[in-house]
A protein has these predicted regions:
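Basic, Lys/Arg-enriched alpha-helical interface segments
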Residues: 1-76, 86-89, 96-134
C-alpha cells in the first residue's frame, strides 16, 4: 500500500495513494465544485490541526462511524480515517454527504483499505511518499 504524507506534527496524517502523483483524498478535495471550496479549504486546515493537536473531541467535527473507523466533518464534506500505533492517522478518502447516513459503499471501501493497510504492514509493504528521503 502507498501512503502520502498530508501533515506532520504531534500526530502524522497520511492519505492512501495509488502512487506519488495520485492520491484520491487530495484529488477529491482539490476537485470539489466552487460551492464546496470553502469546506475543502477548511478540511485541509483541519487535517493540519489534527497533526498538531490530535483528532478533535468535538463530535460535530470528528466522530466514530463504526468499529475503528472515524470521520472528519466540514460542511457536507467527509473524510474517513482510522488510527494506527505511534499516533498515525490514515485517511482512506473523502466524499460529499448527501443524505442523513454515511453511504454504505464509502464505509465498505474504507474498511477494505484499512484491512489492506494492516495486512501490508505485517508484510512490510507500506510505501510512504512525501517524507524526506523518499
Amino acid at each position: 500500500m502507498n501512503l502520502l504524507l498530508v501533515s506532520k506534527g504531534f500526530y502524522t496524517v497520511y492519505a492512501v495513494a495509488k502512487s506519488r502523483e495520485h492520491c484520491e483524498l487530495l484529488e477529491f478535495l482539490g476537485g470539489v465544485d466552487q460551492t464546496l471550496q470553502k469546506d475543502s479549504d477548511r478540511m485541509l486546515a483541519l487535517l493540519g490541526r489534527v497533526a498538531m493537536e490530535g483528532p478533535p473531541r468535538n463530535t460535530e467535527i470528528s466522530h466514530q462511524i463504526k468499529g475503528k473507523l472515524f470521520e472528519f466533518i466540514q460542511g457536507r464534506l467527509r473524510v474517513l480515517w482510522f488510527y494506527d500505533e505511534r499516533r498515525l492517522i490514515i485517511c482512506t478518502g473523502g466524499f460529499v454527504k448527501k443524505g442523513r447516513k454515511t453511504p454504505r459503499r464509502e464505509i465498505d471501501h474504507a474498511f477494505r483499505l484499512m484491512d489492506d493497510y494492516f495486512e501490508d504492514k505485517k508484510k512490510a509493504q507500506i510505501q510512504i511518499y512525501g517524507e524526506e528521503g523518499v
